[in-house]
């Protein structure tokens, strides 16, 4: 497999746009969770990252990078769909939190693998610039979205606002998956 850099840049842009869009919703989503959950989540996150780091000799290849990237993106898609279907509850907050923790377990691996497979300084620079542009745009869109639904549509309830932004997150996440798949090509 090989990375198609132009499409990969769009994937990274959209991925960071999602992060910018979603960042404010986490605080409302996680409201039902007990603070001790975050402590245990941190312990499991550290253990998971340790386990992944010990697997580098097996998974630091482009095929594993592609599959793990897909796993992360589909995990996020599942969390969004679950929230949209089952709304707010302790179980929903916990499932979404665990989903995010699962994706974070692979964070260091994905950054290291991405750096290895991009190879060139210019490609790495372009990816980082695309990520920052996506993140900034996502935060601006998120801010605008919340302002519009609060002041133009009169929706003042934070839970309803966060529920609505999840439809944008759903479209964003589906676009991310499509672009991720398009970013890789099998070598002939």
Where do the protein language model's features map onto the residues?
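Substrate-agnostic recognition of the 12-TM MFS/MFS-like secondary transporter fold
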Residues: 8-20, 24, 28, 99-146
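Membrane-helix interface and helix-disruption motif detector
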Residues: 30-41, 87-96
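Central cavity-lining transmembrane alpha-helices of secondary-active solute carriers
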Residues: 40-57
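C-terminal ends and interior cores of transmembrane alpha-helices
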Residues: 73-94
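A membrane-interface helix-boundary motif in multi-pass transporters
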Residues: 143, 147-174
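Cytoplasmic membrane-interface "Motif A"-like loop-to-helix N-cap segments
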Residues: 58-72
């Amino acid at each position: 497999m090989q990375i198609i850099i132009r499409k990969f840049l769009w994937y990274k842009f959209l991925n960071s746009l999602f992060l910018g869009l979603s960042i404010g919703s986490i605080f409302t989503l996680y409201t039902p969770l007990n603070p001790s959950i975050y402590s245990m989540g941190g312990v499991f996150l550290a253990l998971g990252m340790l386990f992944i780091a010990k697997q580098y000799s097996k998974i630091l290849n482009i095929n594993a990078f592609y599959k793990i990237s897909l796993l992360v993106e589909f995990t996020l898609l599942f969390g969004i769909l679950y929230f949209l279907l089952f709304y707010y509850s302790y179980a929903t907050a916990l499932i979404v939190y665990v989903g995010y923790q699962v994706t974070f377990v692979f964070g260091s691996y994905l950054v290291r693998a991405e750096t290895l497979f991009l190879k060139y300084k210019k490609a790495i620079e372009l990816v980082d610039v695309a990520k920052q542009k996506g993140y900034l745009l996502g935060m601006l869109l998120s801010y605008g979205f919340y302002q519009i639904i609060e002041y133009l549509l009169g929706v003042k309830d934070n839970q309803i606002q966060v529920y609505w932004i999840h439809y944008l997150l759903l479209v964003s996440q589906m676009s991310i998956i499509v672009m991720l798949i398009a970013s890789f090509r099998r070598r002939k």
